[in-house]
């Protein structure tokens, strides 16, 4: 009888799982951008319009540095935060602003300071804005890099015959997916935290990169802004696991002379699933997340680049 009861319970659970399993819709329809939507790519290979040097008279410029979050992976060019800030500042301040985007997917902090030094200042920036993502301190030996490689290998592995048979069960798939996601998330959290340990070589280099960028900007009288993005594949409320890392980066950037914009508070009341390109398949910020970021960044500009004085009446 016990065996029969167990079998019946499993069958009921299987049926319930199949009935209740939806398509995982979040209420947000992702905008799937193809290769043609990655345009424009300018003559220097950046995802940007052609920007002339030296800076034309009457133009104000942000030079934007970062990785795929700043480049705008998964969103249209006009939806990425640099272009949104460009439009917002031009409209709100009555000035001609350009956001020169020198970002590139996969760049880390050390590479970003090199690009600023070798190319960025040639555009005559009125402000330098660095989009900081938590993997900017990563190197090839990082635990998170190893976890990501392991995940990619696991996803590409062909299941065996027994595993394929069991995978036909919705209940088995559900349990396995939940267990796998829990274990992977624990590895992910541990991996990112290890990348900000005081003795971790990648963080030491990234910290020094912030100091160097701050010094380069200070020597030229150019304001430096560091924008800290959260990792969106996590609850963005009190359960967010990387708040201490945000604080550590903010302290380092502030000590380097930067105006810090931590975006985490801006996303606190938003379901993270509404902020990503395509759920767990692509956790880059979508156009909603870019819009929220641009609003926060544009507000911060008043602190570092004063608005033009209102014309006096005769």
Where are these regions (language model features)?
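Hydrophobic membrane-insertion alpha-helices, especially the h-region
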Residues: 1-15
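Membrane/wall-proximal cationic-aromatic binding patches
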Residues: 15-93, 116, 267-271, 277-280, ...
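Conserved SGNH/GDSL esterase-like catalytic core that processes O-acyl groups on lipids
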Residues: 61-63, 69-160
């Amino acid at each position: 009888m016990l065996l029969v009861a167990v079998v019946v319970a499993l069958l009921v659970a299987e049926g319930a799982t199949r009935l209740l399993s939806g398509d995982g819709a979040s209420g947000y329809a992702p905008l799937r951008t193809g290769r043609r939507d990655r345009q424009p790519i300018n003559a220097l290979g950046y995802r940007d319009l052609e920007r002339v040097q030296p800076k034309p008279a009457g133009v104000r410029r942000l030079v934007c540095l970062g990785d795929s979050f700043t480049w705008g992976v998964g969103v249209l060019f006009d939806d990425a935060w640099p272009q949104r800030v460009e439009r917002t500042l031009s409209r709100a301040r009555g000035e001609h602003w350009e956001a020169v985007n020198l970002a590139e997917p996969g760049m880390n902090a050390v590479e970003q300071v090199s690009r600023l030094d070798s190319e960025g200042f040639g555009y005559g920036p009125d402000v330098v804005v660095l989009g900081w993502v938590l993997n900017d301190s990563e190197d090839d030996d990082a635990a998170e890099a190893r976890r990501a490689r392991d995940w990619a290998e696991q996803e590409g592995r062909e299941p065996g015959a027994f595993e394929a048979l069991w995978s036909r069960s919705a209940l088995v798939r559900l349990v396995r997916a939940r267990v796998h996601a829990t274990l992977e998330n624990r590895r992910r959290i541990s991996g990112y935290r290890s990348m900000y340990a005081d003795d971790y070589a990648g963080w030491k280099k990234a910290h020094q990169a912030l100091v160097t960028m701050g010094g380069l900007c200070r020597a030229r009288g150019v304001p430096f802004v560091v924008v800290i993005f959260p990792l969106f594949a996590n609850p963005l409320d009190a359960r967010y696991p990387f708040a201490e890392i945000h604080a550590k980066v903010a302290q380092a950037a502030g000590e380097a002379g930067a105006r810090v914009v931590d975006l985490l508070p801006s996303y606190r009341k938003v379901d993270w699933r509404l902020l990503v390109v395509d759920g767990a398949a692509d956790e880059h910020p979508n156009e909603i997340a870019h819009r929220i970021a641009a609003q926060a960044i544009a507000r911060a500009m008043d602190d570092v680049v004063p608005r033009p004085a209102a014309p006096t009446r005769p």
